[in-house]
Amino acid sequence: MINRTSPEVRVPRLLVVHHTASPALRAMLEAVLAGARDPELAESGISVEVAPALAANATDVLAADGFVLGTPVNIGYMSGALKHFFDQVYYPCLGAKPGAPYGLYVHGDNNTTGAVRAVQSIATGMGWAEVVKPVTAVGPVGKDAERQCYDLGATVAANLALDRPARRIGTTDG
C-alpha cells in the first residue's frame, strides 16, 4: 500500500506583542484583535497569537509571519516592556523575517512621536515592512481610534492572507 501523505499546510501566523498597562491600551488591543480576526479573513486560516511584551521571545518571532506591536508612551519613548522585547529578540532574529508586515499602535497622555519613531527604527532594522500607518491616541481612546486599531489589525492580517511580500506604505515596490 502506498502511503500518500499530503504536504503540510502552513498557516500564516500573526504575532501581537503588546504592553497593555491601561484601560485605553486594553481597548486598543481588543480592537486590533477584532480586526485581525475579522470574519472575512477567517477563511484564510490566519492564526493570531497574542503575547505580552515581557513574555514574547525569539521563538515567537521566528514562528511568526507578521507582527502588530502595541505600547504606551513612557517619558516620550516606547514602554520598557516593549524595549525589553526588542532587546531579547533583536540579535537572534535580525534579518530572519525580511519584509514581514507589521503595524503599530501607541497610546500616550501627550506626545507619541518619540515612541513611534523608536519602534519604527527598530522594526526597520529587523527588516520588517510597515504596511499601515501607526495608530496613535493621546488621552482618552474614542471610537475613531478603536476603528483605526480594528483597521490596523485587519490590514496586517490581510497582508498575510495575500501570501506575497508585504509592500511598505508610501512605496510602489512589492
Question: What is the predicted function of each stretch?
Answer:
Residues 53-130:
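Helix-loop-strand module that forms the ligand-binding subsite of alpha/beta enzymes
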Residues 13-15, 47-49, 103:
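A structural signal for isolated positions on well-ordered beta-strands in alpha/beta enzyme cores
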Residues 2-4, 41, 57, 129-174:
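Glycine-rich phosphate/pyrophosphate-binding loop and the adjoining helix
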Residues 1-17, 53-67, 153, 157:
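Glycine/serine-rich loop-strand microenvironments at binding/catalytic pocket rims
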Residues 2-40:
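N-terminal beta1-alpha1 ligand-phosphate binding loop
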Residues 43-55:
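A short beta-strand-loop structural module common to alpha/beta enzyme folds
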Residues 20-23, 106-111, 137-142:
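Short histidine/acidic/glycine/proline-rich micro-motifs that form metal-
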Residues 28, 81, 115, 145-148:
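Residues at alpha-helix caps and immediate loop-helix transition turns in enzyme cores, especially N-
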